[in-house]
């Protein structure tokens, strides 16, 4: 992409756009799966596990479609397990460590609200395959958002300790949200084709939803200035490499192995 004139979409823009959606779900699902057996209570353990399974299921559908769009003979497993960190294009927020339960909930809530708007818009995409995937994912994401926003309310309007942890997580993670609705040449090109939605209306609805949830949870809206992260362009934090080294260990150690 760096060799192209500024603002010019690459020839494989469609593939890259679908891959971004896939990678965000895959990496977030991988992060959530680390809570299995470690959540504060059995109900939350099962809840987070179900969210992780849904996200990985979404990623599989999107990765399979991305592989077909790429047309290089790769499949969902090759895209998931045989790419290096700079080749991933997930939103940077998804790759951040789980931290405590409060940080996990705040991260999940921010991304659930984003996916809720994104999948609702993509369900009417001119790309019928992508629209079908988005329609299925939207049903799951509604549940994800109810789970995370419900827990945000409990934490924010709970004890002094839970509120402090939720507020700290919100302040720390807020700067990563600027990437959600900052369009680049791929977003713009896909929008002109009717594949992707315009991001400005989504940003307005997301902001309204987030502000209402923050107020309901008796939290303060962050004053942190957003930072222009570029996870969807392959620029990541150091945390993604550590996550991938664990996630990809078996396929890379035993190449081509079949169960």
Q: Can you annotate each of these PLM segments?
A:
Residues 28-50, 115-130:
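Helix-loop segments that flank and shape redox-cofactor active sites
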Residues 24-32, 58, 62, 111-118, ...:
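Amphipathic, well-ordered alpha-helical segments in soluble domains
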Residues 2-17, 82-108, 155-162, 173-196:
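Acidic/His metal-coordination segments adjacent to aromatic residues that form catalytic metal sites
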Residues 52-82, 148-152:
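Conserved alpha-helical segments that form or flank metal/cofactor-binding pockets of metalloenzymes
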Residues 13-18, 39-58, 104, 129-141:
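Alpha-helical scaffold segments that form or flank carboxylate-/histidine-based iron centers
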Residues 164-259:
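Extended, helix-rich structural scaffolds rather than catalytic motifs
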Residues 93-147:
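Internal, conserved structured core segments that host functional sites
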Residues 31, 65, 92, 120-122, ...:
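Domain-scale activation on soluble regions of proteins
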């Amino acid at each position: 992409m760096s060799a192209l004139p500024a603002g010019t979409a690459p020839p494989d823009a469609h593939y890259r756009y679908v891959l971004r959606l896939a990678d965000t779900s895959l990496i977030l699902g991988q992060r959530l799966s680390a809570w299995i057996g470690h959540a504060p209570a059995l109900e939350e353990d099962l809840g987070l596990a179900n969210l992780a399974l849904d996200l990985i299921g979404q990623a599989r559908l999107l990765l399979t479609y991305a592989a077909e769009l790429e047309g290089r003979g790769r499949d969902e497993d090759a895209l998931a397990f045989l790419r290096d960190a700079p080749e991933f294009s997930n939103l940077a927020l998804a790759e951040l460590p789980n931290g405590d339960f409060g940080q996990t909930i705040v991260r999940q809530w921010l991304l659930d609200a984003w996916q809720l708007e994104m999948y609702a818009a993509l369900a009417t995409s001119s790309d019928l395959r992508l629209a079908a995937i988005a329609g299925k994912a939207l049903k799951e994401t509604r549940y994800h958002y109810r789970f995370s926003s419900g827990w945000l309310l409990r934490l924010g309007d709970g004890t002094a300790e839970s509120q402090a942890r939720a507020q700290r997580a919100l302040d720390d993670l807020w700067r990563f949200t600027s990437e959600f609705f900052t369009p680049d040449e791929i977003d713009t090109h896909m929008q002109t084709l009717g594949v992707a939605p315009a991001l400005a209306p989504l940003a307005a609805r997301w902001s309204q939803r987030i502000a209402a949830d923050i107020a309901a949870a008796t939290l303060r809206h962050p004053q942190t200035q957003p930072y222009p992260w570029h996870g969807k362009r392959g620029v990541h934090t150091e945390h993604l490499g550590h996550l991938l080294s664990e996630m990809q260990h078996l396929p890379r150690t035993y190449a081509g192995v079949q169960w």
